[in-house]
Amino acid sequence: AVRTEKPQAVAEAPAGTTCDRLVSLSDLYATLADYFGVALADDCAEDSVSNLPLWRNPSADAVREDAVQQSIDGSLTIRSGKWKLAMCPGSGGWSYPKPGVDDTSLLPAFQLFDMEKDVRETHNVIEAYPDVARELRDRLTKYVLDGRSTPGTPQANTGAPVWKTVKWLEEQAL
């Protein structure tokens, strides 16, 4: 059991206020720990960042530079600013083209989307912005190899590297 003093209000921003900063569902862990004053061990919630400053002041500085997501088939994406790099052909998830259901053999192995102009992710702009794609891939590679996307001691990924969805780690080019 954790005993804490009565915490202050979670959100101090006026009702109806919006925040355009990048956050991730994984941030809930660190945010709640921060709210309740619980220190997290270095090997706990390695991809979680507290959003509490944003709950209290939506115009505060961003709490994270980028976010990693994993789709239902295990494919990884990285989101940074207006960019999203998907390390898979197709959707990697529930929408068309679905992995294992729809033919993705003729699709590019990787996709880059400008989320400010294309929130539906329909226009792959990887050929127009190869430097952006390489930068995002390099960051994602570091996160996977470090076992975390936050500062701290690198963490081991458990088990043998059998994820087919990270085979791009061994490939050189995008």
Which role does the model predict for each range below?
Residues 7, 13-17, 21, 26-29, ...:
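C-terminal cap/loop subdomain of S1 sulfatases and analogous C-terminal strand-loop tails that border
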Residues 5-8, 172:
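Compositionally biased, intrinsically disordered low-complexity regions
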Residues 28, 80, 91, 100-111, ...:
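Long, internal low-complexity/basic segments
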